Amino acid sequence: MKTCAILCAAGKGTRFGGNTPKQFLFLKNKMIIEYSLEVFEKSHFIDGIVLLVPQGFEDIARYLKDKFSKVIFWDYGGNERADTVKRGLEILKGECDIVAIHDSARPFITLELLEKLIADVETHFAVAPGILANDTVKFVVDGHIQNTLPRSNICLIQTPQVFKFDLIYRGYEMFKNELFTDDLQYVERLGIKPKIIENSRINFKITTKEDLLIAEAIVEKGYW
């Protein structure tokens, strides 16, 4: 079965600030996006990668396509993450059986995790990594606690999220007017209960400058 990846790199990083989207900033001697691209490139399970970037960053897209042989196509993403993923799915329609969707601002994925997710999707249809909540979780409205959620049932979801292609494509088609915050929700709405693989907290998304400082420390200390 053919497996492809969609690498979402079209975010402008409004919460992060600055003129350069965070996925194109350098961590030591390479861009943040290159860390995850290296893992997808190395995996024997991955047959091709579609890269979605913001307008104005064509030179970076061309550079990455030249550097990584499995990047088969690049294009512009949309205004919202969901628009970007939908564009990637349209590009890959009819080209693969399984698709892995990953946020390029998560540099610290492992080959072991990626291939475990792909292997498990054969029987579970939709699989994603996640971490169990350590802190007590409150549901808050307008700055006031409404209730406390059971921590033992709370999981913080990461990427890559892996799907049978036809399933996630159908979810995006049926709920195309929704702007869910992750891709799992599109198949959950179809009645699927995705499988979660417990993963390391190091697979965090770089969203703020504080996150970047942590990522820099991880790389500088040789932990990655």
Swiss-Prot record:
Pfam families: IspD. GO terms for molecular function: 2-C-methyl-D-erythritol 4-phosphate cytidylyltransferase activity. Pathway: Isoprenoid biosynthesis; isopentenyl diphosphate biosynthesis via DXP pathway; isopentenyl diphosphate from 1-deoxy-D-xylulose 5-phosphate: step 2/6. InterPro entries: IspD, IspD/TarI, IspD/TarI_cytidylyltransf_bact, Nucleotide-diphossugar_trans. Coiled coil: none annotated. Its EC number is 2.7.7.60. Signal peptide: none annotated. The record marks R15, K22 as: Transition state stabilizer. GO terms for biological process: isopentenyl diphosphate biosynthetic process, methylerythritol 4-phosphate pathway. Keywords: Isoprene biosynthesis, Nucleotidyltransferase, Transferase. The record marks R151, K205 as: Positions MEP for the nucleophilic attack. SUPFAM superfamilies: Nucleotide-diphospho-sugar transferases. It comes from the Bacteria. It catalyses: 2-C-methyl-D-erythritol 4-phosphate + CTP + H(+) = 4-CDP-2-C-methyl-D-erythritol + diphosphate. Catalyzes the formation of 4-diphosphocytidyl-2-C-methyl-D-erythritol from CTP and 2-C-methyl-D-erythritol 4-phosphate (MEP). NCBIfam families: ispD. PANTHER family: 2-C-METHYL-D-ERYTHRITOL 4-PHOSPHATE CYTIDYLYLTRANSFERASE, CHLOROPLASTIC. Belongs to the IspD/TarI cytidylyltransferase family. IspD subfamily. HAMAP family: IspD. This is 2-C-methyl-D-erythritol 4-phosphate cytidylyltransferase. The gene is ispD.
